[in-house]
Amino acid sequence: MPTTANRSREQSRASWQLPDGVSRGTWDYVTEPAIAIDYDRFHAGHPLLELDRKLIEAHLGPSPTRSDGSSRIAVDLGCGTGRNLIPLANLGWRVVGVDLSLDMLGQFKSKAKSHVQSQPVAIRANMAHLECLADGFADAVLCMYSSLGMVQRRENRRSLMKHARRILTSNGTFFVHVHNRGSWLRDPGGVRRTIMDWLRARRNSNWELGDSVYAYRGLPSMFLHIYSERELRRDLNASGLVIKNLYRLNRHSSEILTGTWLAHLRSGGFLAVCTRH
């Protein structure tokens, strides 16, 4: 873990010193210890966390081994405290957690020590630059709970997707969740917000339609990019990924949306299950 002096230097980095794809708000988030320490308690009971776990489990199946008898490997990009990886490790998977937050990785390793026999691999890395990960070794790559949306600028989000494709085995599976900006149109002032966001994106090359900056857990400028379904499909396809299932989630992300009528407005988010081209 970083010393107090090193942590202070990290937290005070100038904006021009931040890694690609990392906004000031995201940097504040990943360098604030309290965010990681309180993460599990803060998010406990959120329905999406149970829903995505069940969907991942259903698609990956019960077997932790490949046809040659070796253990299957799962990589979680933006792993946080390891909520997706620890259940897989308990089944016998080998797991790799990737996060920009040293404090999140520390929480992940601490939890794993208490819950699983084999220690996971924990890697600090920028989601836009994952060259540290080898080609074709992962049976599953996860990027859940809108971790993709925390990456600033489209080219950096596509870079993450391309790396996910690259590290997958030939029959591996990529899971990704994003929030849906179409649901804005149902909110009071949502139409105006969408129009103003579109105009801002036209005038400011550093702003993209779907970008959002807001106060969050004591941080003044948390960043999140919120997708449309069409944008998500285009980015996955451009990154060499084939969508096998795209689940539209209900407004509260507690279950899969039923019916297709005005789904782009009714859905609170999307969970895509993909393979390589």
Regions of interest found by a model, annotated:
Residues 2-69, 71-78:
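Conserved class I S-adenosyl-L-methionine
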Residues 175-235, 245-252:
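SAM-dependent methyltransferase
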Residues 140-155:
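A short SAM/SAH-binding and catalytic strip from SAM-dependent methyltransferases
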Residues 158-170:
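A short glycine-rich, Lys/Arg-flanked "PGG" loop and its adjoining helix->strand segment in the class I
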Residues 82-129:
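Class I SAM-dependent methyltransferase SAM/SAH-binding core
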Residues 132-141:
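A short acidic, Gly/Pro-enriched loop at the edge of an enzyme's catalytic core
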